[in-house]
């Protein structure tokens, strides 16, 4: 017999991989005491109840029912509700084994999403005394989360319902079922469930599935917004769960992405939960939790909501020292680990961003452990830089300006084009500068041009400008631009495009630089950008006109418009390009010849444009029916647009500064009007004298006037 392979190595490697370790320079912390030991010791308290297997006949029926609900091809709401009722009748008494089955758990989740309030209560009743087991289960925990969200909506409805709604609900109960459970308020059922979880709270914190249930319970008790279960930045589900829900097409209903009213008893339950959890923690274990991949988000949430029920902020002071205390060597080592660890930095960033911690707590940590090395932390592109970004919007104005003074002169060095590092830092610096009254704005602009367009002359841009600006930011070479395999734009491309759009919104100099880069591109490459799902937005955002535009910029605008010649019809018939053609209507203000040229190009292939869904929208937005049939009215639209650009509408109170040629024309018109008035007065005087001479009344009047003067 050959030598047998020793067992348990994979598990040992995995535990070592997941085990958080402090750096060697972290003093006074026991590096041997890892959270893995706590995890292994707590697993003994995890309930593991077996609810039975679903047989093949039942499985086929429930799979078909799940598919029917997924397609949702019911003719009416009543038909769908009838189908749900029949499935619930078939599932009665089998709910627990269905939610623990991979396939049937999807059906139960759909049933809960579509169920009415009475049906929800029935399902809730079936789960009683088994909530803990379901929370620790891989599939059942997802069903339980959906049930909790809908239960929160039902609790709010019971709190706010009118007498008429109560009467209607009572009638529905009598018609559907005589079960006494429907007479019990949902609030009482929910509190009963909360009591089931209390002995297991410390075990739930670091469990892969139960921790998500615990976070949702805390959000409901605190009356916070319950996030979506499918959006990428949701705190409700894990990343894998959100991807899976998209693949199986389970969508949230209107109960997600909102907060609910909660009864006063929930505050007491939240206080009890916080006290129960904190009783099982000390400073060492709490700090270990804060750098634990699963436990850290739970601790972040507890710090965020503890202020609702605990003035002393026990969780915060369990991890960090009191605000009256000075620098501590153990705390300093812990903060240093947070600033250099991926999980720890996310924990610190989250508690700074959220409104749970008091500003003086954050200010203490900043002054003691971060202020003297702001620039060094900003160079940690995967950890410390996110802390600095969060601090920019939480500290006092003086401290924010200090951070800006440290980072702005080195901004060009901090940004890495190749590694796509610190683009977010540039974004946050711009926002912080704007919030401080455009603090050091010109320096930020110069630093960004030094980094992304070092050869570009900001004051005197020339015609031989290269494409380095958009190439360095968008990384067009190697992107999905021009691919014929229908590749989806990557998240990286989307992030870069949004950054360029941000720069163009920040200062018009970036718009001018982008125009020169567009003109330096081969026309085919530029057209590919217009057809790209992400880069088309960059083109669209660049087509803006500055108020009181100088003549040189207007000439540059004409040159940019020449690129679109012979491309209008193709763009108009494309889902992305059609938005660009729509934008050209405003971009061609004061350039009626270019408007006419674009409209003529659309008219030349009107049949093709009108056959396209997007082309028809462009045809309408450009007022092409007026262009074809009533050219004078179309010209009136252009004139109206020019008046709006100059601010000469009837409702406008401010007048623009007039150009010299306009002032000269006004002077000439005023002089001509004055001369006409003088000529008219002279003519009227001559006519009057002739009339007086003819009637003989003039001399008498003169005598009378002379007598008065005497």
UniProtKB/Swiss-Prot annotation:
Region described as Disordered: spans on this chain: 1-43, 648-710
Cell location: Nucleus, Nucleolus
Domain of life, source organism: Eukaryota
Record field: compositional bias (Basic and acidic residues): 652-680
Renumbered ranges of Pumilio repeats: 90-125, 126-161, 196-232, 280-321, 329-367, 369-405, 520-557, 562-600
Major location (coarse): nucleus
Keyword Nucleus: yes
Gene Ontology MF terms: RNA binding
InterPro entries in alphabetical order: ARM-like, ARM-type_fold, NOP9, Pumilio_RNA-bd_rpt
GO BP, sorted A to Z: endonucleolytic cleavage in 5'-ETS of tricistronic rRNA transcript (SSU-rRNA, 5.8S rRNA, LSU-rRNA); endonucleolytic cleavage in ITS1 to separate SSU-rRNA from 5.8S rRNA and LSU-rRNA from tricistronic rRNA transcript (SSU-rRNA, 5.8S rRNA, LSU-rRNA); endonucleolytic cleavage to generate mature 5'-end of SSU-rRNA from (SSU-rRNA, 5.8S rRNA, LSU-rRNA); ribosomal small subunit export from nucleus
Comp. bias (Basic residues): 1-16
Main function: RNA-binding nucleolar protein required for pre-rRNA processing. Involved in production of 18S rRNA and assembly of small ribosomal subunit.
Similarity remark: Belongs to the NOP9 family.
UniProt name for this protein: Nucleolar protein 9
Species for this entry: Candida dubliniensis (strain CD36 / ATCC MYA-646 / CBS 7987 / NCPF 3949 / NRRL Y-17841)
